[in-house]
Amino acid sequence: MLDFYYLPGSAPCRAVQMVAEAVHVKLNLKYLDLMAGAHRSPQFTKLNPQRTIPTLVDGSLILSESRAALIYLCDQYGDEDNDWYPRDTIQRAIVNQRLFFDACVLYPRFADFYHPQVFGNAAPDGRKRLAFEKAVELLNIFLSEHEFVAGSKMTIADISLFATLATACTLGFILRPYVHVDRWYVTMVASCPGAQANVSGAKEFLTYK
């Protein structure tokens, strides 16, 4: 069983949990209370000098970036022909691009807009909201031609993006104007492994201060 240091309110943590469920990997859940400073303990700092979650431990392997963990879980534990992270080079490249879109565009813009409000009681910043909205508009374009973000089948890229948007929706972001994203989100809630835990975990984010 793999050790998994996490917080339920963390979107990247929930993405790892959903993919683990998809490939039938059991995680030994280790709740890490960041608000209490548990990530700064000597024990955790030795394990992960970045002091970040999620942190996935499989024997001597320690992964502290969620999307790297998603890829590893599929490569190491997924079936040879699993669709979560396809073996075909071109299909995999598209999945990677969508994963990096979440890592480098959507999630950072989400955090830039919402984190100051949640953790610092800041007033909403209009420019930051516009930047996040533009990222969702791009996702809407990606979803305009296919059912899922990288083609006709759900992949780890969908799961990573689903985790990010679940938190945004919990914080009041409305997907209805983005018709393709809205349609996709409904599908993810209905059919993604671990979807209900993702949605309920997103609600816990509201309690973090």
Swiss-Prot record:
Its EC number is 2.5.1.18. One of its GO terms (molecular function) is glutathione transferase activity. Glutathione binds at S10, R51, T52, I53, E65, S66, R67. It catalyses: RX + glutathione = an S-substituted glutathione + a halide anion + H(+). Residues 1-81 form the GST N-terminal domain. The keyword Transferase applies. Homodimer. Conjugation of reduced glutathione to a wide number of exogenous and endogenous hydrophobic electrophiles. Belongs to the GST superfamily. Theta family. PANTHER family: GLUTATHIONE S TRANSFERASE D10, ISOFORM A-RELATED (PTHR43969:SF9). This is Glutathione S-transferase 2. It comes from Anopheles gambiae.
